[in-house]
């Protein structure tokens, strides 16, 4: 079509409020052959937002590997689905709720959990676990403490009330997140329906059902809000934050799963971002059909709502179904039995349009593809080389920095870092045992492990499998400082660490869901970070054979304050799931018995570049991140999994932030045991040996009775890439560096107190001088 010749009814200010550029408006008029009305402009505003259409990232996402022998559903549906054998299928996905959580932390985080759970059960899967990846500014700041407290409370409240265990996650703290926290929520479910539920509408004349809660004005324009930078004025956007009701969500889960098992549901889509607009247009476009709806039939919680508000509302706990004609009454009765609304609001039509009625009039009529597939895409030029500022940071010479005069105090300083310290303040607010399937609880290992129960497909129907020992392991990982210094290598390291964490509990990595949290793609450096990180994820996933089944992109994570714009560290969070063949053969990180032998498997070249040691003790974020030897990484992970499967390894823990000294201390703290060990002097500086970070490194313990057999096996499997470090002790922590005047000798109680108080003392605003003695 061609653009209309008459002048636009909308001013530049109108378009700016809808976050549409003049060029995008012209494209709209070309697609529909006329000027849109206000309702239609609002629909385009949300559907063409970065949050919904990925207009800046879509070309980059095409580089991800998305297929594999276990992948049943890849990107494009509500969640990815994989086959884990024994007739069991698992759905999983990660999504962000960053901007809402910055404005209203409790509701922003709570509805983030609710939204990701709906993505899971919309596929026909019962949610069995959730995880989260969180980023905040330093807790010394009162506003950051308030955001942290609100977000954790919101996650705990929603997850606890809805009855889905929060089994794991990660929390990082850095000044770049002070104005823009990150809240990424991941959920996992096991399919309870014979067929995977799809979202493409089908069957001309089939009724369209609105089910769930009522529609109000909450969350108005939330998708557009989530696609803009935050500023000092963002607090005025509180109406763009949704309000959740976990008890309604619990009923919705049960009602939907029961409805799917009847076979009366042709297609289903949850109403998340962009509400009715997104659910109707995506269902129509995916099915190659149209949908018409009458807004007068939509259940409401507020009076006087106009079509614009209906179409852009993001009220929670709502779904849109296409039902088999003649069976809508059966579904309505089912939902009413669960105390939920279920109303026929429209029908599937042959014309590929979304047609909206209100008060007997057509108030919006748009091609479904114009709202979805025809959204603009902006392939941008990638900088041919890193920005000068990044090159300068990478060239930082940390060799000139003074080494610690007291290595024990240096270790305690790292354990007191909220990024490294215990996250028990967080996970003790979560119910991680509800459903009674959690095999490994938060804080006990490098990944969560959840039992998978046999699934019944309905009354009188055969279970998927009569009995299984299988379980699912899950983790979320990303060292965003690495990604800031080197987006490509940092993203690869994030994927490798996620796989390593799964391997440390005995799980085989299977597939990935990613959450790309970045700044503005319109800035050359921002797009370069995004593009290079996507390449890193793609290459690492290919090497590890972990296809990407879906995810989320959150851009414009920048804060404008006092005329200055600050972007977050680029944070491509990797959610990864793995298969545990036997839940009775898993591994935790804690040392088990005095006298056990402690080994290091693998271990690349340690470096202080981008390390927590540099950040905590020197206030520096610079240098080259660790080098990743992917062949060694794969080899070390394979050995770790096999050692756990054989019952040889009693504990396993990967070496991450803080290096070997911190990893060993964590094993002691969680096991209430000590250590007597010597680190090989593989670097002239003792602080690099103790606190340098590396990839492909795992600490394991064995029973001394198995020493000869174990070392013969390690020699065959890893050649010289392993080392006996020492033994587990009863109470004291004694760590030395070979041929160096360096010794860390302290009590485990001192380590534990410092580690466990890292977050609580800051949340209680206790100065270091008044904190428990280290």
UniProtKB/Swiss-Prot annotation:
Keywords carried by this UniProt record: ATP-binding, Cytoplasm, Ligase, Magnesium, Metal-binding, Nucleotide-binding, Purine biosynthesis
Claim: Membrane is one of the keywords in the record: no
Enzyme class: ligase
Binding-site positions, substrate: 96-99, 118, 242, 314-316, 554
Binding site for Mg(2+) 2: 119, 270
Keyword DNA repair applies: no
A GO CC term attached to the entry: cytoplasm
Pfam families: AIRS, AIRS_C, FGAR-AT_linker
EC number(s) reported in the record: 6.3.5.3
Subunit annotation: Monomer. Part of the FGAM synthase complex composed of 1 PurL, 1 PurQ and 2 PurS subunits.
Role this protein plays: Part of the phosphoribosylformylglycinamidine synthase complex involved in the purines biosynthetic pathway. Catalyzes the ATP-dependent conversion of formylglycinamide ribonucleotide (FGAR) and glutamine to yield formylglycinamidine ribonucleotide (FGAM) and glutamate. The FGAM synthase complex is composed of three subunits. PurQ produces an ammonia molecule by converting glutamine to glutamate. PurL transfers the ammonia molecule to FGAR to form FGAM in an ATP-dependent manner.
Designated name of the protein: Phosphoribosylformylglycinamidine synthase subunit PurL
Organism of derivation: Gloeobacter violaceus (strain ATCC 29082 / PCC 7421)
